[in-house]
């Protein structure tokens, strides 16, 4: 199992029992190296939908071996002719979803080089793309702009404090943040 799929499996195993979690299926294009010419391929907004009363959360999970995640890893390949990233619409759709009450949208980045994981609001990830000159998001920026998701290493796998993340997001929603 590749590291991305393992991160997703560990994240899903960390979901608290009082939350509903659904993993949106990857398209066939994903399995064929991002082949965009496949007909009828699914193009999902995010990786996971997590619902715990009274909130719904959209999570896109990314893992990277380096201390900085390239924008192409978040937004897909850059199309010079169109001056945009191939999957940029996913993040803009997540930002649109954030506009509805009781709903959040985050890009969760696992920086394996520093063993830290952060849930960054999709709106801040999109703002980084347009306002920063960097081509990658360093973990220090994620620490400043996101919420750290604490992790505990088991023998082989990891458990993430998803319950703590959901509680924090619920509290921020209650406070109107």
Residue ranges and their predicted role:
Residues 48-50, 55-67:
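Conserved catalytic cores of phosphodiester-cleaving nucleases, focusing on short active-site segments
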Residues 92-127:
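Nucleic-acid nuclease catalytic cores
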Residues 1-41, 176:
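Acidic-basic catalytic patches of nuclease active cores, encompassing PD-(D/E)XK
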Residues 44:
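Beta-rich catalytic cores
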Residues 142-177:
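Charged phosphate-binding loop/patch that engages nucleotide di/tri-phosphates or the phosphate backbone
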Residues 64-93:
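Mg2+/Mn2+-dependent nuclease catalytic core
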Residues 29-32, 66-69, 115:
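Short, solvent-exposed loop/turn segments at secondary-structure junctions
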Residues 122-156:
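Short, low-complexity, polybasic intrinsically disordered segments
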